């Protein structure tokens, strides 16, 4: 029985402190779960946060002595109410990026030393957009799995968060890694696991590093996130902005100030070139797999659509650079070519979106019903920003709208 009260704010009330209030609630839930023959599972944030020992779990820069000092000072707050900690619950010690910190290990040990059941919770997907990254978080999955085995804990949980809604096909390598290391511990290295994964997923002919396209794709996807945005732009919040085309979308070249845009956005241009180079390599690998009888073709098709979307943004930046530079070159044909590339972006995107939606819709419902209630609070979960599938392409859609306002095209 999963209780999700970890994000509920608490305030002191009638002389009762936050930690004690949280424990009162946990005990009520545990009594309810026991009556229904269920085992309650809690995220353990609140007790540790209210006691002041929370931050060291996520800080790998502080020394063991500093962590011990924090615990020596604040553990008394936990021990004051130790008898009120429910014994029939599992305390879920989540840590998705820093599971091997001394602070995290110390917190887990505290539970077991005080007769409480604790499990670790790692993640195959957190808040990455478009696809899981950090090599599917495999290093963290392995670290937490090995630590849990060494501590003889009863189990380990793999979370797969949908806050940013990548396609579920792209979660599968992280799930496989969790199975591998949770069941087998430290028997294989991460590189050995990746070889095994390629073998089992695509076929024995495709197990070597020549076909390791997933890790390659991570960098272009990371660059894609803000490729078409201004410095202040934020993709998840675009739908809530008053005028995102002005505030969040990258500015366009000023045709009266030749070359200025390219100088200002030299870093984006560099990133776009780098991204496109890698994406072209990824495209070749995926196409080879698709054309040579690999297994799990649908997974490859989804990765291919991710790569196509990433390529579009990089190409758009390079097209703007070409337009900006073409103003400094006395070649009419070159200018006409750069202008045509800009005008063709809308058609390229329309074609891309048709194929993207065709692939994703095989296993995903893209459009919500008209009565669906979108985000109304401070959260900005991408898929909850529009009724239709526009949320996946908001940066691209707004960028293309802005592009239509580019003045003086015909004067080139």
Where are these regions (language model features)?
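Aromatic-residue-lined binding/catalytic grooves and analogous aromatic/hydrophobic interfacial grooves
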Residues: 1-6
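Substrate-binding groove of N-acetylhexosamine-processing glycoside hydrolases
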Residues: 9-412
């Amino acid at each position: 029985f999963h209780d999700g009260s970890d994000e509920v704010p608490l305030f002191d009330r009638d002389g009762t402190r936050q930690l004690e209030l949280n424990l009162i609630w946990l005990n009520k839930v545990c009594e309810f779960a026991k009556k229904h023959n269920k085992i309650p599972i809690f995220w353990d944030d609140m007790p540790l946060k209210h006691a002041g020992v929370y931050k060291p779990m996520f800080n790998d820069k502080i020394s063991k002595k500093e962590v011990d000092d924090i615990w020596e000072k604040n553990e008394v707050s936990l021990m004051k109410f130790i008898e009120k900690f429910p014994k029939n619950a599992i305390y879920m010690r989540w840590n998705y990026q820093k599971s091997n910190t001394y602070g995290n290990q110390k917190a887990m040990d505290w539970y077991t030393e005080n007769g409480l059941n604790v499990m670790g919770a790692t993640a195959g997907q957190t808040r990455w957009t478009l696809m899981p990254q950090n090599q599917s978080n495999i290093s963290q999955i392995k670290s937490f799995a090995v630590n849990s085995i060494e501590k003889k804990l009863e189990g380990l949980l793999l979370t797969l968060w949908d806050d940013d809604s990548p396609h579920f096909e792209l979660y599968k390598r992280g799930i496989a890694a969790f199975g591998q290391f949770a069941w087998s511990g430290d028997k294989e290295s991460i590189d050995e696991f990746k070889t095994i994964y390629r073998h089992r997923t695509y076929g024995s002919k495709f197990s070597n590093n020549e076909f390791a396209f997933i890790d390659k794709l991570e960098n272009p996807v990371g660059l894609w996130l803000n490729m078409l945005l201004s410095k202040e732009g934020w993709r998840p919040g675009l739908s809530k902005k008053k005028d995102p085309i002005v505030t969040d979308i990258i500015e366009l070249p000023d045709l009266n100030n030749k070359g200025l845009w390219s100088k200002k956005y030299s870093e984006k241009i560099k990133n776009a070139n780098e991204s496109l180079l890698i994406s072209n390599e990824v495209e070749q690998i995926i196409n080879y797999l698709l054309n040579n009888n690999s297994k799990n073709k649908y997974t490859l098709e989804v990765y291919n659509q991710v790569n196509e979307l990433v390529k579009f943004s990089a190409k758009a930046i390079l097209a703007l650079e070409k337009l900006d530079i073409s103003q400094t070159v006395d070649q009419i044909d070159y200018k006409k070519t750069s202008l045509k590339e800009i005008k063709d972006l809308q058609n390229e995107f329309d074609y891309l979106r048709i194929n993207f939606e065709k692939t994703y819709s095989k296993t995903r419902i893209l459009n919500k019903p008209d009565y669906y209630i979108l985000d109304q609070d401070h959260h900005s979960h991408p898929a909850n920003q529009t009724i239709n599938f526009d949320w996946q392409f908001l940066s691209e859609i707004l960028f293309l709208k802005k592009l239509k306002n580019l003045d003086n095209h015909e004067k080139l």
